[in-house]
């Protein structure tokens, strides 16, 4: 068996690669004056195509990891095997969008006139171009998305189905409008131009998913009274408005929510599913619908609703004024019964999720006296030491799901069953951005090699 480098050496190289990636991306945080996003992409894509060709020809045989039997048996966890340009996840620092941390995004990206949180449109511009947009560019993109947001009637959906089932079905219903499928079937488009109809589909899809998602919400929980889109509002504010929440703070929360949930590199189930299906040249509607079906799984996108339900169970059994000592006992009882504390731990992160921290800062500013937020704060103090003492958890710290439900609940969006739909709307920005780059870079059909246990037994026996 050939071991290219030790695991520790690979780990050091990966850490250095993350640092270098952040450094190289920082160079691209420069503004440009072009207001049209597609024109920006037309300038950038040829440079990145050349970069990929050079990387493949000059460094194509350089090993980037050491595959172990554990990785094969463990769902490929930790295996480096996917190109994902829009974001990179570091175990210590958390997610970086094109090299920018969440605090940097909050500080640098344009916000609404009356708000402080980044506009999702400004993050979308960053994800696609690697450049920070001007306020004018973000506003222009906001206007463009509003103009693209027309959605055909989807009343055939059963109103009793799970919100995610309705949401994914609604996205599939939009697929008949795919520009990519139309161009491919006509056969008059070259491979180098695949990204252009993909761009049209991606922006149309990003524009339309809040309309579909709010339609599902109003249909299920508000007697079907639909609130039309207001093209004077930005993306996050419009989504909040169409759901039926028009307070300035809820609109600000929605901007923050969409931004921090937009992307989390390419290895998670929804991102990988979207990339995998897209690699077959399925259009963005089909690819994103596949991503949503992955997101609907209990091990991926349902955690945010499970956290809120668990917190409400704590209140129901122990009261809102539960002390830290009582809370410790409750957490131990939960763990000793074979259950987990939802919202704690992460497959990659080894510190508190920065997405949790920025939500906590929002709560400290806007709802410091809310009883459920105070309970979340107590859990932040109580749970990590207990999980550390337990000794079976690599990351005892809270993740993004530990906080989001309490914020949404405070502003009146109390239907926890719907929360994964909000997650899905947010993920459209990252997944669709990467689909454009997948086609722009000409990435191939994904087709990993699989083996059986006999193969693994024989291989390990020969290489002991």
Curated annotation (Swiss-Prot):
Pathway(s) served: Carbohydrate metabolism; tricarboxylic acid cycle; isocitrate from oxaloacetate: step 1/2
Keywords for this protein: Mitochondrion, Transferase, Transit peptide, Tricarboxylic acid cycle
Coarse class of the protein's main subcellular location: mitochondrion
One of the record's GO molecular function terms: citrate (Si)-synthase activity
Active site per database record: 300, 346, 401
Record InterPro entries: Citrate_synth-like_lrg_a-sub, Citrate_synth-like_sm_a-sub, Citrate_synthase, Citrate_synthase_AS, Citrate_synthase_euk, Citrate_synthase_sf
Transit peptide: 1-25
EC number per UniProt: 2.3.3.16
Gene3D superfamilies membership: Citrate Synthase, domain 1 (1.10.580.10), Cytochrome P450-Terp, domain 2 (1.10.230.10)
Reaction(s) catalysed by this chain's protein: oxaloacetate + acetyl-CoA + H2O = citrate + CoA + H(+)
One of the GO BP terms on file: tricarboxylic acid cycle
GO cellular component: cytosol; mitochondrial matrix; mitochondrion
A Pfam cross-reference name: Citrate_synt
NCBIfam families: cit_synth_euk, PRK09569.1
PANTHER family from the UniProt entry: CITRATE SYNTHASE, CITRATE SYNTHASE, MITOCHONDRIAL
Note: Citrate synthase is found in nearly all cells capable of oxidative metabolism.
The name this protein goes by in its record: Citrate synthase 5, mitochondrial
